[in-house]
């Protein structure tokens, strides 16, 4: 057997069987959705701590009643904190930057996977949705699915890539997010 490969056997065959190994696009899509969900949760926490507008809590429809109560207590307690504001800016910049992949400019941005902040309000001529200007990301799932079919290897490299051939990831969105967050979560 091959490590990391799952065989889905359908039944016995009297003829030779041809095996095709395909990337698990569904697992990749789920991992990307989970990453974006975690990013949005972090942005929500930063927004709650650094802003006083209670309406932002109402926009977070996934919060339980207890979480809403806690969020209201924490609302704005670190308003003006430069550390959190720098972190928010750093994370937003990281999500918007291009990263080197085998497909070049055809797959260099998270937006090309369907991951972006879409601040335009639906149907509003030139209007913006205030809630979407808080740094949250959205996923256009059809774009994500198509990118994972057409550019799977480059999409993988977009998140983590060895650009100098030393077999160590040194570039990519996940790599950059880790580097941006590391100073805030390390001990000491």
Give residue spans per PLM region.
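Gly/Ser/Thr-rich loop/hinge elements
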Residues: 68-71
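Short, glycine/acidic-rich hinge or "gate" loops at secondary-structure transitions
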Residues: 49-63
